[in-house]
């Protein structure tokens, strides 16, 4: 077998008939498969043992040689080599064809490579190949020229003979006519009878003349065709061709079918054709030039690659190994076989029949028909259904050809090469494991035993519980008690990987340390649910076992759940308390007033009745009061603390030099809040507020912000421990909070009817106006929708006011644990407006709440929207998965290759926003809204200087939160940062341009697969949001508008209702022309006016920002009008701009920024944070190539797409050699097109359009350098990312100078040398020798 680690490249080319015969171990001559009586393969058949190898290991077909000792011997009786049966997966055969056939990929593919090479239209090719017309393959012009006068004389002679024959025939007939007339006259016939005879004779003579003329015309046509005869000339008239062959076969050759195509290819001069085509390209224009360009691509491909074009016509076809097209016996004695066997049998049957007919000397028409059938059967074998109706099997099912085995989701690439199944894995339902630590998972004992079976067996033998592996296996299978103890040892510190499908981002697989649990369900840590998007309603997860020490180390260091708290997309924590935990922490940190609580232990200020109460000397004293029932958890108290750090303002006031542990301070707080702060690290500032998951306020603290802050300031291990404590506290206190929901908790509005009656009256007035014709249908619809939305809002607000704070329903919402206020409105107020299947509102609202119950009509109306929601969700989930797949494909080879590419280029990003006072004057600066997603985690490309020109931060500085604050304080509005868009690394990106890894907060490591992380970061929220509509019960935001827009942007499509953009800066002049505007821009530089005609009024003019005269520094948004000024790139109509226009007008940087802004706008509208750098990676891949306009001295073909880094290299070489550089135009490619244009043919073929990619790659003899991840996964090599890159693989360990000196210095023997002898301390007991050493 081939070792994948031996080669560095994989090349694909065209196989010639000699190659096919060289691969083959023998010719398959019969269509038989196996003998149905003996069940042995037939000799010379499709499963022949002589060709493909024995069906049993080390045994020939006849049984003369058995056992491995005869290895390599070829049996003289049956001719089968004694070897392993595994060779039947590798050995190929071949079929010698009685007539050549063309390869359908090259003839029928788009564009037709054969057609371009021979300059024949696909229609004509089809006629030739399938015996519908003849083609001239060669003409002996010299012989024709030299013999032309002789041949012409012969032809004139023949014409004269025809004329003479006709004349004699006519004379003969005239003579006979005279005789007939004389006879009639003698017989006294009437004039009428004589006239008839005369007319008949005239007609006959006319026929003779016409026949003669036709014969002469025919001879003229034959002669004219012959003297103009040229190679590649098609002759559709069969009689004309036969005549030419009869008369002049010595002067030309021709024919029909693949033989003629083969002859044309053999006579084809590649170099001369390429030269001629280049000449046409340089001097021609229009269609002729375009055709020449397309043809030159194919001709140059053969010229450059050294492929023999004759390989496109086959004289022998390969037969793939029988184990890859198996035949298996079913229970009923029937056989199931691969479709390929049927297709091969058709080829062999037709081939044998053709051979027999040729031997018998059958008429040409029959032989040609048989050749055509052979061509069709080979077409069906290679690509069934590509031409004409597909060959079908039983039940009219099209048979799967060789192409179908490669194509699509079930094809070889995606099913078997990229989606292999693995052993040491299991799968089970998940349940919650609240007792687990963040890095642990509960593994069912039986599953663990099966997964760790080899490890357990080894330890059983090592610990002398079993004598050998066989008995150890028996012990494991019988589940002896000792086995469980050994299993505990085997699993300790051996992480397992858990995966939940769909794995939308890298946190869909994480490593955990297993803990054995009873039952059959896997227990998952509650905080890990968010990353896996898991819930416990029947979800299943798969377990995988990393086996080698390296795999275990990687799982522990890189994949352990406690090391993966942050999202790789935004750097925000994913392991966040949710649901019950949030309720518990909200309850714990809630504060209620003393009156409300009414306990003795609550804080009460001093008054005339006595000193202040509720002041505690320590936390222990407060807990004691709580345990005795004197103090409430949420009651306000004052506690003296010395083990928790005070809040920042208290620390600044009381401890100017900084607080040290042990120093006391007085906290105005509640007991619950102190308990919560005990969870946090001791030196974390005290948090005084109520903990919520979302919807912050004055005294509310967002749990996300806390976890974010912890992740930024503390090591991951501390964060993980804190999260675990939060989880425990959350569950503990949510149990004690007694938050439950009963029907009695859903309060109903007492005055809802009166409220709605008012709106009902207004709705009636609208209907009356509509019926009287005062309103159009659209106005009526808009007014009713507006009216009932107001009604829903009013009722909803009243419901909110009705609920007391301690009601569990608003408590769940206010804490951010689940749901939103709108759902409470639906539950207790009214559902409001619902949509129909088209997405329009139904103008009758649902006035009842779920508590009251819907009427039949309301339920029916509601079902439209619900059904639409579910259908949309299902469709968009598939869309989103496909988007992710395309993104991964386009970015999979973007890996961090080097530390620093050394570029000084970068992009400008906003840092600070001005703070204006009422007069519009700048009073200070604040952080820009987009800092988190654009600036954070980058490296400065240039010095950041303030207004005075002083350097605040030097180039190369990492932009941490601290550094960003420095920039904001210095009033620096924007800075130039390093970006992957400007990275100069030829393949992949450099660490400096990428910046920090969002998942770790540290500089990205070399070898990190940042392309795939980027694709996952963009694709995962798309899917999450589409799915989340189902969880929300149809309420709230939805990505409907968003996902198609993201696809449109990444595919670089022209948007629907595309808006034109200004190509120059100037003043606009508008002309109204009915349904359209004509807009003219008068440029500032005095150049020619730019006119935009037929701008749709319906689409509407775009809005523009105009400075307010009354308020300096303030702007208003309004529609463009006459005399407005527009800048370059500004949109003129409402709608999205075409990225291709943006590239043309604003250049590369303009389109980059446009795409980032547009994609981010979609995600921000959904509340999803994705760092710009991920989108930049995809955009970099979209803008990687350019079109060659002038090739200069380089080898590029004009009109071809070239990688810009390659072009740069070729240009510098051309200039160095004193030549002309190539001229290129930047192109923006959609992600699908960019994926297919990749250098790696393996990656492109496994993505889409497999046959087209392989056809193209074979003609160009493409070599895959195995740079990306996908191609290495396909061939089974270690991927070139992470620890798989060469700089980590090829490490040789050498001692340092100091170590070398120490090793070769003269040793001195101290007492320690006589210490440990391996026998341990003296005990008096004998020690077994094998234990001692």
UniProtKB/Swiss-Prot annotation:
NADP among keywords: no
Entry annotated with the keyword Transmembrane helix: no
Any GO BP annotation: DNA-templated transcription
Ligand binding (Mg(2+)): 535, 537, 539
Disulfide cysteine pairs (residue numbers): none
SUPFAM superfamilies: beta and beta-prime subunits of DNA dependent RNA-polymerase (SSF64484)
Listed InterPro entries: DNA-dir_RpoC_beta_prime, DNA-dir_RpoC_beta_prime_bact, RNA_pol_asu, RNA_pol_N, RNA_pol_Rpb1_1, RNA_pol_Rpb1_3, RNA_pol_Rpb1_3_sf, RNA_pol_Rpb1_5
Organism domain of life: Bacteria
Biological function: DNA-dependent RNA polymerase catalyzes the transcription of DNA into RNA using the four ribonucleoside triphosphates as substrates.
Binding site for Zn(2+) 1: 60, 62, 75, 78
Gene name, Swiss-Prot/TrEMBL: rpoC
Catalysed transformations (reactions): RNA(n) + a ribonucleoside 5'-triphosphate = RNA(n+1) + diphosphate
Subunit structure, as described in the record: The RNAP catalytic core consists of 2 alpha, 1 beta, 1 beta' and 1 omega subunit. When a sigma factor is associated with the core the holoenzyme is formed, which can initiate transcription.
UniProt-annotated binding residues for Zn(2+) 2: 901, 983, 990, 993
Organism in which the protein naturally occurs: Corynebacterium glutamicum (strain ATCC 13032 / DSM 20300 / JCM 1318 / BCRC 11384 / CCUG 27702 / LMG 3730 / NBRC 12168 / NCIMB 10025 / NRRL B-2784 / 534)
One Gene Ontology CC term in the entry: DNA-directed RNA polymerase complex
Named cofactor requirement(s): Mg(2+); Zn(2+)
Pfam families tied to this protein: RNA_pol_Rpb1_1 (PF04997), RNA_pol_Rpb1_2 (PF00623), RNA_pol_Rpb1_3 (PF04983), RNA_pol_Rpb1_5 (PF04998)
Matches recorded under CDD domains: RNAP_beta'_C, RNAP_beta'_N
EC numbers for this chain: 2.7.7.6
Cofactor: record remark: Binds 1 Mg(2+) ion per subunit.
Gene Ontology MF: a single term: zinc ion binding
Family: Belongs to the RNA polymerase beta' chain family.
Identification of the protein by name: DNA-directed RNA polymerase subunit beta'
Assigned keywords, A-Z: DNA-directed RNA polymerase, Magnesium, Metal-binding, Nucleotidyltransferase, Transcription, Transferase, Zinc
């Amino acid at each position: 077998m081939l070792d994948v680690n031996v080669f560095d490249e994989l090349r694909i080319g065209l196989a010639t008939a000699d190659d096919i015969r060289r691969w083959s171990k023998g010719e398959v001559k019969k269509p038989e498969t196996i003998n149905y009586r003996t069940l042995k393969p037939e000799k010379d058949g499709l499963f022949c043992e002589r060709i493909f190898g024995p069906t049993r290991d080390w045994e020939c077909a006849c049984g003369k040689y058995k056992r491995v000792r005869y290895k390599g011997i070829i049996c003289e009786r049956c001719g089968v080599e004694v070897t392993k049966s595994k060779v039947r997966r590798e050995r190929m055969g071949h079929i010698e064809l009685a007539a050549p056939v063309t390869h359908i990929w090259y003839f029928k593919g788009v564009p037709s490579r054969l057609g371009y090479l021979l300059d024949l239209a696909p229609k004509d090719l089809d006629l030739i190949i399938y015996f519908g017309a003849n083609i001239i393959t060669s003409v002996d012009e010299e012989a024709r020229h030299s013999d032309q006068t002789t041949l012409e004389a012969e032809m004139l002679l023949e014409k004269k003979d025809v004329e003479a024959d006709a004349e004699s025939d006519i004379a003969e007939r005239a003579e006979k006519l005279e005789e007939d007339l004389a006879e009639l006259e003698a017989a006294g016939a009437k004039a009428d009878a004589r006239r008839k005879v005369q007319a008949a004779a005239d007609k006959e003579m006319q026929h003779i003349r016409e026949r003669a003329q036709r014969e002469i015309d025919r001879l003229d046509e034959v002669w004219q065709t012959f003297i103009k005869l040229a190679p590649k000339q098609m002759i559709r008239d069969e009689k004309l061709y036969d005549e030419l062959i009869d008369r002049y076969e010595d002067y030309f050759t021709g024919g029909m079918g693949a033989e003629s195509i083969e002859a044309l290819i053999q006579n084809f001069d590649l170099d001369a054709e390429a030269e001629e085509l280049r000449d046409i390209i340089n001097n021609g224009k229009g269609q002729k030039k375009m055709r020449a360009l397309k043809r030159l691509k194919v001709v140059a491909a053969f010229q450059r690659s050294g492929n023999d074009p004759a390989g496109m016509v086959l004289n022998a076809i390969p037969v793939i190994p029988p184990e890859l097209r198996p035949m298996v016996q079913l229970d009923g004695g029937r056989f199931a076989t691969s479709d390929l066997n049927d297709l091969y049998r058709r080829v062999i049957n037709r081939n044998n029949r053709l051979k027999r007919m040729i031997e018998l000397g059958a008429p040409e028409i029959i032989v040609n028909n048989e050749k055509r059938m052979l061509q069709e059967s080979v077409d069906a074998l290679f690509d069934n259904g590509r031409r004409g109706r597909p060959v079908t099997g039983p039940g009219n099912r099209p048979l799967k050809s060789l192409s179908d085995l490669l194509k699509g989701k079930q094809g070889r690439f995606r099913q078997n090469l990229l989606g292999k199944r693995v052993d040491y894995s299991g799968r089970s339902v998940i349940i919650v494991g609240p007792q687990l630590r963040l890095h642990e998972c509960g593994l069912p004992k039986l599953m663990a035993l099966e997964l760790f079976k080899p490890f357990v067996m080894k330890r059983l033998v090592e610990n002398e519980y079993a004598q050998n592996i066989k008995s150890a296996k028996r012990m494991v299978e019988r589940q002896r008690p000792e086995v469980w103890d050994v299993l505990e040892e085997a699993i300790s510190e051996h992480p397992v990987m858990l995966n939940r499908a769909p794995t939308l981002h890298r946190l869909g697989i994480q490593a955990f340390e297993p803990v054995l649990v009873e039952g059959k369900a896997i227990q998952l840590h509650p905080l890990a649910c968010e990353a896996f998007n898991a819930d416990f309603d029947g979800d299943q997860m798969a377990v995988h076992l990393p086996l080698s020490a390296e795999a275990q180390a990687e799982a522990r260091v890189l994949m352990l759940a406690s090391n993966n708290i942050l999202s790789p997309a935004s750097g925000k924590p994913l392991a966040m308390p949710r649901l019950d935990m949030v309720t518990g922490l909200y309850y714990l940190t809630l504060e209620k007033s003393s009156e409300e609580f009414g306990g003795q232990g609550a804080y009460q200020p001093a008054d005339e009745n006595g000193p202040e109460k509720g002041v505690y000397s320590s936390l222990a004293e407060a807990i004691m009061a709580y345990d005795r029932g004197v103090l409430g958890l949420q009651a306000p108290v004052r506690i003296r603390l010395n083990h928790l750090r005070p809040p920042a303002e208290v620390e600044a006031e009381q401890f100017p030099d900084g607080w040290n542990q042990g120093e006391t301070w007085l906290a105005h707080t509640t007991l619950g809040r102190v308990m919560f702060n005990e969870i946090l690290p001791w030196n974390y500032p005290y948090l005084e507020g109520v903990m919520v998951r979302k919807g912050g306020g004055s005294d509310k603290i967002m749990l996300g912000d806390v976890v974010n802050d912890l992740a930024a300031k503390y090591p991951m291990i501390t964060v993980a421990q804190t999260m675990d404590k939060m989880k425990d506290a959350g569950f503990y206190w949510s149990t004690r909070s007694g938050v439950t929901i009963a029907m009695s908790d859903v309060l109903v509005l007492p005055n809802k009817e009166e409220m709605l009656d008012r709106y009902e009256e207004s709705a009636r007035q609208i209907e009356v106006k509509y019926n009287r014709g005062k309103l159009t249908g659209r106005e009526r619809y808009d007014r009713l929708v507006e009216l009932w939305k107001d009604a829903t809002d009013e009722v909803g607000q009243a419901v909110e006011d009705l609920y007391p704070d301690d009601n569990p329903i608003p408590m769940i919402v206010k804490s951010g644990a689940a749901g939103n206020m709108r759902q409470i409105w639906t539950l207790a107020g009214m559902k409001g407006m619902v949509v129909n299947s088209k997405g329009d509102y139904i103008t009758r609202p649902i006035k009842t709440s779920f508590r009251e119950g819907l009427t039949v009509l309301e339920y029916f109306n509601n079902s439209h929207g619900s059904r639409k929601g579910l259908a949309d969700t299902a469709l968009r989930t598939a869309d989103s998965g496909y988007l992710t797949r395309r993104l991964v494909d386009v970015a999979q080879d973007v890996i961090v290759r080097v530390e620093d590419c050394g570029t000084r280029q970068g992009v400008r990003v906003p840092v600070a926003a001005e703070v204006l006072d009422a007069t519009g004057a700048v009073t200070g600066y604040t952080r820009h809204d987009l800092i988190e997603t654009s600036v954070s985690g980058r490296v400065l490309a240039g010095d950041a200087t303030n207004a005075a020109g002083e350097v605040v931060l030097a180039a190369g500085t990492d932009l941490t939160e601290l550094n960003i604050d420095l920039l904001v304080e210095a009033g620096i509005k924007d800075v130039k940062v390093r970006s992957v868009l400007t990275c100069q690394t030829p393949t992949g990106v450099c660490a400096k341009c990428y910046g920090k890894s969002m998942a770790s907060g540290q500089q990205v490591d070399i070898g990190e697969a940042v392309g795939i992380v980027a694709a996952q970061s963009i694709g995962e929220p798309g899917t999450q949001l589409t799915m989340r509509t189902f969880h929300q019960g149809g309420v709230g935001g939805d990505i409907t508008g968003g996902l198609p827009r993201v696809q449109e942007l990444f595919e670089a499509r022209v948007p629907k209702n595309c808006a034109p953009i200004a190509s120059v800066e100037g003043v606009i002049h508008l002309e109204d022309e009915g349904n359209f505007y004509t807009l003219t821009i008068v440029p500032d530089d005095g150049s020619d006016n730019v006119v935009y005609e037929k701008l749709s009024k319906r689409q509407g003019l775009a809005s523009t920002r105009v400075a307010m005269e009354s308020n300096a520094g303030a702007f208003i948004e309004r529609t463009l009008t006459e005399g407005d000024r527009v800048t370059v790139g500004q949109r003129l109509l409402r709608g999205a701009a075409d990225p291709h226009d943006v590239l043309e007008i604003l250049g590369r940087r303009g389109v980059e920024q446009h795409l980032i802004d547009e994609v981010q706008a979609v995600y921000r509208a959904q509340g999803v944070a994705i760092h710009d750098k991920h989108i930049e990676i995809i955009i970099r891949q979209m803008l990687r190539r350019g079109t060659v306009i002038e090739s200069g001295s380089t080898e590029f073909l004009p009109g071809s797409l070239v990688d810009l880094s390659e072009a740069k290299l070729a240009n510098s070489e051309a200039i160095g050699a004193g030549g002309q550089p190539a001229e290129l135009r930047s192109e923006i490619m959609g992600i699908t097109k960019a994926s297919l244009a990749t250098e790696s043919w393996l990656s492109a073929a496994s993505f889409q359009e497999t046959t087209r990619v392989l056809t193209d790659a074979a003609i160009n003899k493409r070599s895959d350098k195995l740079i990306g991840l996908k191609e290495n996964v396909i061939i089974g090599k270690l991927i070139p990312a992470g620890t798989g890159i060469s700089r980590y693989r090829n490490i040789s360990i050498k001692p340092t100078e100091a170590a070398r000196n120490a090793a070769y210095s003269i040793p001195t023997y101290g007492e320690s040398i006589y210490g440990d002898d391996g026998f341990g301390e003296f005990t008096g007991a004998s020690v077994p020798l094998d234990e001692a050493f």
